[in-house]
A protein has these predicted regions:
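ABC ATPase nucleotide-binding domains
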Residues: 1-88
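Short, surface-exposed, polar/charged, turn-prone segments marking secondary-structure boundaries
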Residues: 35-36, 42-44, 49, 92-94, ...
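ABC transporter nucleotide-binding domain
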Residues: 77-109
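Non-catalytic connector elements of ABC transporters
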Residues: 96-100, 107-173
Length: 173
């Protein structure tokens, strides 16, 4: 009702504060879709306040992620997901949540690697120059589950056992 009242007034800006929080999951998905469609059709600047990262990621062109009243990072949803500027941002954005490993930057066979307990991970080429300054130091390595792929035994860098699979219809967690 409140959104309908705002629409008929032809505002220049919408401020929507925790609008979908009280809706069940199915209705929230439907209303989120409709709100995005209406906002796009009207071309009205919309400031949407939410604690739900799914709402933020799916509805926003630009996100300002805040913690305790301070801006932690701002940018497009993809910027925050792919290039978080802090552990807080990396942990907040993405489902399932990013995996964090405490590792030491070491040199093995002339290349840099992350030593995470018994696990040894190659430092990606695009991070080698940056990681030089951390050689011998501990860092936190973030691994997004969506970026991991299965490889035949003996060909991957990480060996493990799948403990649980959550089917989502078109994918799995």
């Amino acid at each position: 009702v409140a959104v309908g009242r705002a629409l008929v007034r032809d505002p220049q800006v919408f401020l929507l504060d925790e609008l979908l929080g009280n809706l069940d999951a199915k209705l929230r998905d439907q209303v989120r879709y409709e709100l995005k469609k209406i906002q796009t059709q009207l071309g009205v600047t919309t400031i949407y306040v939410t604690h739900d990262q799914t709402e933020a990621m799916t509805m926003a062109d630009h996100i300002v992620l805040m913690k305790d009243g301070h801006i932690m990072q701002q940018g497009t949803p993809n910027d925050l997901y792919a290039h978080p500027n802090s552990l807080f941002v990396a942990s907040f954005v993405g489902t399932p949540q990013i995996n964090k490993l405490t590792c030491k930057v070491v040199e093995k066979g002339g290349s840099l690697a992350f030593q995470c307990g018994e696990l040894l991970l190659s430092v990606p080429d695009d991070l080698t120059a940056l990681m030089q300054q951390y050689k011998g130091k501990e860092v936190i390595v973030g691994l997004r589950p969506s970026e991991l792929t299965l490889a035949p035994e003996g060909q991957g860098e990480i060996e493990g056992t799948v403990d649980s699979v959550e089917p989502l219809g078109d994918g799995f967690i």
